[in-house]
Amino acid sequence: KPLIESGCISCGQCVSVCPTGALQERTTMIKETPVDTVETDTTCSFCSVGCSLKLESCGDMLIKANPDKEGTVNAGLACGKGKWGFDCAMLEDKLEDPLVKEDGAFRDADYHEAFVLVAKKCQSVAAKYGKDSIAVAISDRYTNEEAYAMKRMAEAMGAKVLCMNNRESGLEKVTGLNASPNTIDELLSTNLILKVGFQDEASRVIALKIKQAEEAGAKVMTVCNGENSLALLKEIAKAIIDSGKAKNAEGYEAFAESLESVKVGEAAKAVADVYMNAKKAMIVFTQ
């Protein structure tokens, strides 16, 4: 049976822990040859988990990416994107120099020419339509340092900064912070984990932590892994309210009133009972 048809998630851990060297990874080099590499500590930018990686490079060439065993977030774990996705930095058709469009076609330009052209165009548009007409769009894949540098440049131009994947955070409205109130390692010391709309494929490292917690005795329940998720969540919330165990939450009365007409099904009641009786429970969801 081909490996790709098995439960393999292409994380590369088998290669990393192989004690004999029988398993080896393919390198980005055309010809296999020993090279002296420089190791650089970095953070994976493929998702928001923030796994620590050690990139090995030789000159301008990236050779391999290894998960950092001492990483506070991933502790030596990595997903397929973090382990193998570094080669996107060396794509042959990757844009490396500025291009200027003239007469419907692009031509190469140096950075000075590009900066001057952008500044003049921005000044022209702002003078005609106002400063609010200028915006700088950045990728959510940027590092904090890159995003900060782009923000400073936009401020100098008097422009807005737009992120291409900047969705409104529901978590911030509930907790007041657009970040998890718990750490990933707390998954390993909990009794119950509710996976609400969470797909393992979206975050393999978190999924591995959940699997470790389950092997240590934690109960894992998958909730709303499909359609009609909001209806089931309302039923679970109504069951908890009907139990009388949740009365001190901010905005409780208005929330309880909004659920008065909700009828609680058997599945929702079962989930609510398990959740309320757990000594330590965590909810994992994909926003």
Residues of each region from the PLM?
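Catalytic alpha/large subunits of respiratory electron-transfer oxidoreductases
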Residues: 31-287
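Ferredoxin-type iron-sulfur electron-transfer modules in oxidoreductases and energy-metabolism complexes
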Residues: 1-12, 16, 21-38, 58-61
